[in-house]
């Protein structure tokens, strides 16, 4: 997964 995707998943 892309770093941006990981950040969005953790941000939720």
UniProtKB/Swiss-Prot annotation:
Primary subcellular site in the record, as a coarse category: secreted
Tissue-specificity statement: Expressed by the skin glands.
GO cellular component: extracellular region
Entry keyword set: Amidation, Amphibian defense peptide, Antibiotic, Antimicrobial, Secreted
Chain positions found as Lysine amide: 12
Designated name of the protein: Hyposin-H4
Free-text function comment from the UniProt entry: Has antimicrobial activity.
UniProt record similarity statement: Belongs to the frog skin active peptide (FSAP) family. Hyposin subfamily.
Location within or outside the cell: Secreted
Annotated GO biological process: defense response to bacterium
């Amino acid at each position: 997964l892309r770093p941006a995707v990981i950040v969005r998943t953790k941000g939720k």
